[in-house]
Amino acid sequence: LTLSARLAMLNLAEAQTNDVFDLSSNQPKAMPALDVAVDQLTLSGRDLGRFQLQASNRLARQEGGKVANEWQIEVLRLDMAEASFQATGQWAPVARKAKLPAETAARRTYLDVDLTVRDGGALLTRFGMPGVLRAGSGSLSGQLAWLGAPTRFHTPSLSGALNVDMQKGQFL
């Protein structure tokens, strides 16, 4: 069973955004399969453009032969005039026993990310940082992982590698 939604617009104010992200504080054993497309997503007053998410559940064998649910992120995409972001990945149980923060529920998010920037200055302005960069194009790609749900970016456990290739811009 897949939860599907096609929306022309979705506007989540800051208070609503916090409520959405707090849903993952008591992390479920499985997330629903999703097929969501939003023509215009606004998050905390910031227009993020077109949003698409396709994700499903699967059973996967873990270390020691245990079978557990993994939430597969097949498509995560944001498209705006200045840039396009896409990612694939999974939210899966941590492979080995380790001392983990309580809020992570022994699950880890893994993402392969790709950001194509057409106008870095305009992109930074969109995210509230005007006057930092003029123009600039390029890409950022790599792998990221953190303890906890995809909606709970946990910076203390963040790991990964990113490649940045930017050109034709000027720091102001």
Tell where the protein language model's regions lie, with residue ranges.
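Surface-exposed beta-loop interaction hotspot
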Residues: 16-28
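Intrinsically disordered, low-complexity regions enriched in glycine and serine
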Residues: 63-64
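Small-residue helix/turn framework positions
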Residues: 2-15, 31-47, 52-54, 68-172
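Internal alpha/beta loop-helix hairpins
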Residues: 58-60
